[in-house]
Amino acid sequence: MLAVHFGAGNIGRGFIGSLLSQSGYEVVFVDINDELVRLLKEKQEYRVIIADENRQELLIRNVSAVNSQTEREKVIDYITKAHLITTAVGPHILPAIATILAEGLQKRITINKTPLHIIACENMIGGSDVLKSHVFEKISEADKPLFEKYYGFLNCAVDRIVPNQKHDDPLSVVVEPFFEWVIEKRNIIGAIPPIQGAHFVDDLKPYIERKLFTVNTGHAIASYLGYYKKLQTIQEAMCDQEIRSDVEKALHESGAVLVKKYGWNENEHQSYIQKIIQRFINPSISDEVVRVARSPIRKLGANDRLIGPATQYYDLFGQVPHGLVKGIAALLLFDYENDEEAVALQKTIQETGVEGALYQYSQLEKDHPLVIAIKDQWQHLK
């Protein structure tokens, strides 16, 4: 079996590529990083180190790579032969890979009519739907029914902390022990693709929201409060009792939303929250506060990790979620000068105030009780 994976970065190698290799696939990575592509071609293997007290090492074999800029025809050829296509390139790169993917899929239809699944493993909601829409922009109306017939774009939720890192061997990658890869069955054509460790479900939305409103919410709040207290890593932040208490408070609020919406068992969800907290304090993973805090404007989105659970909490319970509000206020103070969004956010706040920023980025009306509470907390933290 052949899997073509777009994105040879740490998540691609340490999470998706690793699981695909362990599932029996030959994995061909597609990337534009010359050095990574050269090393993967040369060595055809790499190490994945599990970040726990045992430091277990997995040797991932039967891998190769191609450069999508200089070896375009090879990429297209691999797409025509693939049994599975996956991506881990970042949401903003999906439009860039759509052209070559569309080209490869068009050629494949003429020579190989075996159904094929494409899974965008990105930290976003509906990543494969987004990729499909970009691909469909590149093809003719006549080809669209054929693409619908033979190509299943499967949405998924992925969760594994893979921090920034440097090693003597550039291919080695350290990952946390925990991982979750949940794939929606809705667009499967024929047989379910064999992927060891993946979990196939009928409805992905509860899993996406559970991850977004727990892992991403907690991670974000730890990072912004950590930055506020001038701490360097998420682990340092979570060892600060005040920050840990604030994070737990916010996760109980977002958890109340999830339990109410999906009818989950409250005790089971509290256990999930504690599992997530333990991941954040894993001493074997050093995750920089400024990495986790990056792109604050995107994270202020109306349906994203902070505003999403906060507005839903207010709508469901008629109360202000003070843990989430404190996290949002800390985000509004994130002024890291090497982050373009942080710089732009501070400029917006200076020009239009906190109310203007929340209206522009979060679609919250200026007299909304959440806006009033966030501004009060922001002034208190300042």
Swiss-Prot record:
Query: What NCBIfam families does the record tag this protein with?
Result: PRK02318.1-2 (NF002646), PRK02318.1-3 (NF002647), PRK02318.2-1 (NF002649), PRK02318.2-5 (NF002652)
Write the Enzyme Commission number(s) for this entry: 1.1.1.17
> What name does the UniProt record give this protein?
Mannitol-1-phosphate 5-dehydrogenase
One example GO MF annotation: mannitol-1-phosphate 5-dehydrogenase activity
Q: Which reaction does it catalyse?
A: D-mannitol 1-phosphate + NAD(+) = beta-D-fructose 6-phosphate + NADH + H(+)
Cellular component (GO) terms are: cytosol
Q: Which GO terms describe its biological process?
A: mannitol catabolic process
**Where on the tree of life does the source sit, at the highest rank?**
Bacteria
| InterPro entries on file | 6-PGluconate_DH-like_C_sf, 6PGD_dom2, Mannitol_1_phos_5_DH, Mannitol_DH, Mannitol_DH_C, Mannitol_DH_CS, Mannitol_DH_N, NAD(P)-bd_dom_sf
**Gene3D superfamilies, per this entry?**
N-(1-d-carboxylethyl)-l-norvaline Dehydrogenase, domain 2, NAD(P)-binding Rossmann-like Domain
Q: Which family does it belong to?
A: Belongs to the mannitol dehydrogenase family.
Record flagged with keyword Hydrolase: no
Which SUPFAM superfamilies does its entry note? Answer: 6-phosphogluconate dehydrogenase C-terminal domain-like, NAD(P)-binding Rossmann-fold domains
Q: Which PROSITE patterns match?
A: MANNITOL_DHGENASE
Among its keywords, does the record have Protein transport? no
Any one Pfam family match given in the protein's UniProt record, by short name: Mannitol_dh_C
What top-level class of enzyme does the UniProt entry assign? oxidoreductase
Checking PANTHER family in the record gives: ALTRONATE OXIDOREDUCTASE-RELATED, MANNITOL-1-PHOSPHATE 5-DEHYDROGENASE
Keyword vocabulary terms for this entry: NAD, Oxidoreductase
Q: Which residues bind NAD(+)?
A: 3-14
